[in-house]
A protein has these predicted regions:
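Tandem CBS (Bateman) regulatory domains
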Residues: 1-10, 49-78, 84-93, 108-109, ...
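The conserved cystathionine-beta-synthase
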Residues: 14-31, 38, 79-96, 103-104, ...
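A glycine-centered beta-loop-beta connector
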Residues: 27-30, 35-51, 92, 100-115
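Short hydrophobic/aromatic-rich motifs at helix boundaries and adjacent loops
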Residues: 6, 22-26, 39-41, 59-62
């Protein structure tokens, strides 16, 4: 299976001037953990994740005053839609991140999350029994 088989092609995008609260609200509404940040004046897209927002709030920053552009994930890795899901998962583990922006010919075409990979590998309706958590 390839990245194109698991990626989400309808991507939540925000601008660098959006507040962290606006980005978080959009992520909650769309039930996603990341938004691609598109800045017409920058060379490529960025990503802001729920983790980036939590870190900012945890550091005492005001989510209504802080902008997305100041809290982008560092060291962004882009994936090709032709990568295998194994390659994508390995890149995520090596880079210690949970989302890959998928580009083709320099154009944003999707985003792939760890959840997307697990969904493909287990099937949309994984039917195996989930063991109960141990008490204690």
């Amino acid at each position: 299976m390839q990245v194109r088989d698991g990626m989400t092609s309808v991507v939540l995008t925000v601008g660098p001037g959006h507040s962290l609260r606006q980005a978080a609200k959009s992520m909650v509404e769309r039930r996603v953990g990341a938004a691609v940040v598109v800045d017409p004046e920058a060379p490529g897209p960025g990503v802001v994740t729920e983790r980036d927002i939590l870190i900012a709030i945890g550091m005492g920053q005001d989510p209504d005053q802080e902008t997305v552009g100041d809290h982008l994930s560092a060291n962004l890795t882009f994936a090709s839609p032709d990568w295998s899901l194994e390659e994508a998962a390995a890149a995520m583990v090596r880079g210690k991140f949970r989302h890959l922006v998928v580009v083709e010919g320099g154009d944003l075409i999707g985003i792939l999350s760890m959840r997307d990979i697990v969904r493909v590998w287990t099937g949309d309706g994984a039917t195996c029994d989930i063991p109960a958590a141990a008490n204690g």
